[in-house]
Amino acid sequence: MENITIKINGMEVSAPKGSTILEAARLAHIEIPTLCFLKEINEIGACRICVVEVKGARSLVVSCVYPINEGMEVWTNTPKVLESRRKTLQLLLSNHDRKCLSCVRSGNCELQQLCKELGVTDEGYYDGERTPSVIDDSAVHMIRDNSKCILCRRCSAICEKVQGIGVIGANMRGFATFIGSAFDMGLGETSCVSCGQCIAVCPTGALQEKSQVDEVLAAIADPKKHVIVQTAPAVRATLGEEFGYPIGTNVQGKMAAALRRIGFDKVFDTNFSADLTIMEEAHEFLDRVQNGGVLPLITSCSPGWIKYCEHYFPDMTENLSSCKSPQQMFGAIAKSYYAEKMNLDPKDIVSVSIMPCTAKKFEIQRPDEAANGIPDVDYSLTTRELARMIRKVGLKFTTLPDEEFDAPLGLGTGAAVIFGATGGVMEAALRTAVETLTGEELQNLDFTDVRGMEGIKEATYPVAGLEVKVAIASGLGNARKLLEKVKSGEATYHFIEIMGCPGGCINGGGQPQQPGYVRNSVDIRGLRAKVLYDSDKNNPIRKSHENPAIKELYATFLGEPGSEKAHHLLHTTYVKRKVNEI
């Protein structure tokens, strides 16, 4: 690719033709601040924070969208530039709820951080009329507080361009502009799928999950309740970011230790029920293939994807696996098998999950997720909520010793831990399905064709005389593209894995929020996913059907995969919804 040479702050910089000033500056290790910019998602130059001086230009230019040309001279830190950025921040503050002490994003707010770096304080803002403050808490999973919104449009961009939904966007014009749903509808009245990607990219506290930390702590304090917790595979790969660890650090041991010290009676691993999911899903897949069932079979682990399918592809709900998600399977087993084993009344068990996902808050309230007549899972907290809980009870996370999960629901395999990355469920299922079909042990357990962060992946595997065609999609916009190919007959598959969030659970809507400059320059998904693949590689048991705890569960309680008891506890149903219908 042809390079162009420009000068930035008097220093020559070579950058590919077509680059923006912002991109060229980063090649020179110069960080121009941004608020609205998300690479390839939201490149609109709306916030005006990234302005720079360009020789010959009549005014300051927006560096995130301004292309470079040969011989250009740029200055990023002149008094004029710095003053413009300060005034922009002051204008934003003049229409902003500045109650930082009570804001969930305090200390991790991009607006707050820029004000700190540029010396902007409460005393410098402009007083005057403010847009009306609107709080929308109609959705199960999140709250929208427009008094903290800076109109960066990151949320609407990711909802429309990446997820292909577009239930939030800019309303009205000029000073009256606000971000929200159309026709004054609450988010809970729309076909929002609760994926939380809007929260993940929000630079301020305008969007946040509905926290249940206090309710969980109250349950722990109740001596009549037996409170158990499960942690999803992806959480161990990301929780450390909340406590200063580099992206891509496995903190499984410290996480287990923290949960125990918070006061949970038992600390379990969702990897256990991920293995259980594979046993049921592999059985369902083989049954459909061998007995002429509906194909392709599509995975059901991602509740955001499930709700999306119900809204936008209701005619394909028959393709969905009837298996509950690992979270829900765990809850059902905890309030039946575990309760029986521990001689506990299921009504006295409070089941809590720690998930990378905000859609799990919706999933636990679905009517068919109560196998024992009571909810399978009582509370679902995000990774961020767990971090807040750890701080709230006064634990110093970084100095905690590494501890193990509790038996009997704390043992998981390498196949289970890769559920957290796109392609992981498919790979785990193939390990079990192939060995079941062939009756032979796999020599190579790594199905590398289904790995990687590409939005859509395809592979074909010859198994016992059958060419098994599989596909993987992550991000709902990619799911739509894949399913439209299936519906049109352009592509045929036996098995499809879909995850609602781009990259899978490691990039879930409940994961630690990284600032825009990190999201734009670091392979966050790849680093997080590597934690899971390394964990799989180092696990002595890498196939779900070889998990001894799962074997015991079937031998002593469930019988066999697909049994009547397994169907009652571990399988679910779906509904056909309309767009903008709850």
Regions found by a protein language model. Give the residues of each.
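Iron-sulfur-associated redox domains of electron-transfer enzymes in respiratory
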Residues: 4, 12-77, 81-83, 93, ...
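Conserved phosphate-binding elements of NTP-dependent enzyme cores
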Residues: 8
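A short alpha-helix capping/helix-coil boundary motif
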Residues: 1-4, 135-136, 176-178, 233-237
